[in-house]
């Protein structure tokens, strides 16, 4: 049985990323460069059109994808220990921005809009926040979070990334995304395989209850979202050509 174009593209990404993670434990600048060389505006249009024409691939991707509590649609294209993920923040979309870290490093490429990130650090003289410890779901239990008391943190620096920029986020680095919601923003990111342990989660405002059981997307919702993003990329392509 012949593979569809979407299956060919995803298989090609998987083969190359399998080779990368056979050698490298963490994300690095080489992985960021790989993202930049495979997910240009034109290449993204080709990929999205292929996925939208392939019901089987769309269904498989849908089973791994959901609306994240931090305000973006998380589209998991590959999950092979490492994950290749498309993140989309739609204009006007409300979001819950928490300080957090990860049990894995990742590389990220900005596909649309601009992304402002705050990098935070532990500091005895810093602002005091309520901290939670997030435990990921396992085969035996659902995800849960536990209160860990108050922790003083200090803003270390702010970075602004725009279309075409890419960067690496080390595991364990406290950060949060700032997205005012006035524009569509999208990134393609690849996360290294998850390590054992827990994640730090620090809500920025009192009373926020971080969403650890986000709603799954259904196939029609995902198709509609990808089509909307595709139309945005085509308009972006037209602007570049003009």
How would you label these PLM feature ranges?
Residues 103-117, 121, 190:
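Short, conserved beta-strand element in jelly-roll/cupin
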Residues 117-118, 175-180:
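Short beta-strand His + acidic residue motifs that chelate non-heme Fe in jelly-roll/DSBH
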Residues 121-171:
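Short acidic-glycine-tyrosine-enriched beta hairpin
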Residues 86-100, 119, 171:
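Conserved short histidine dyad/triad with adjacent acidic residue
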Residues 61-65, 74, 94-100, 176-177:
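Catalytic micro-motifs at enzyme active sites that drive phosphoryl/nucleotidyl and oxygen chemistry
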Residues 107, 183-199:
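A short hydrophobic beta-strand segment most commonly corresponding to one strand
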């Amino acid at each position: 049985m012949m593979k569809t174009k979407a299956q060919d593209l995803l298989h090609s990404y998987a083969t190359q990323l399998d080779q990368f993670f056979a050698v490298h434990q963490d994300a690095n600048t080489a992985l960021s460069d790989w993202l930049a060389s495979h997910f240009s505006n034109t290449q993204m249009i080709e990929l999205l059109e292929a996925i939208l024409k392939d019901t089987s691939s769309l269904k498989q991707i849908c089973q791994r994808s959901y609306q994240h509590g931090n305000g973006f649609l998380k589209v998991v294209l590959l999950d092979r220990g490492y994950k290749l993920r498309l993140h989309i923040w739609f204009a006007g979309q409300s979001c819950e921005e928490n300080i957090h870290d990860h049990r894995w490093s990742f590389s990220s490429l900005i596909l649309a809009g601009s992304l402002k990130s705050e990098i935070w650090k532990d500091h005895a003289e810093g602002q005091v926040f309520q901290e939670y410890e997030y435990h990921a779901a396992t085969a035996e239990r659902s995800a849960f979070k536990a209160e860990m008391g108050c922790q003083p943190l200090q803003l270390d620096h702010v970075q602004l990334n725009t279309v075409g920029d890419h960067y690496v986020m080390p595991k364990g680095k406290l950060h949060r995304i700032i997205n005012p919601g006035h524009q569509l923003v999208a990134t393609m990111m690849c996360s290294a395989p998850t390590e054992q342990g827990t994640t730090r989660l620090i809500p920025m405002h009192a009373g926020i209850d971080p969403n650890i059981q986000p709603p799954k997307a259904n196939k029609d919702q995902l198709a509609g979202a990808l089509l909307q993003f595709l139309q945005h990329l085509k308009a972006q392509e037209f602007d570049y050509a003009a």
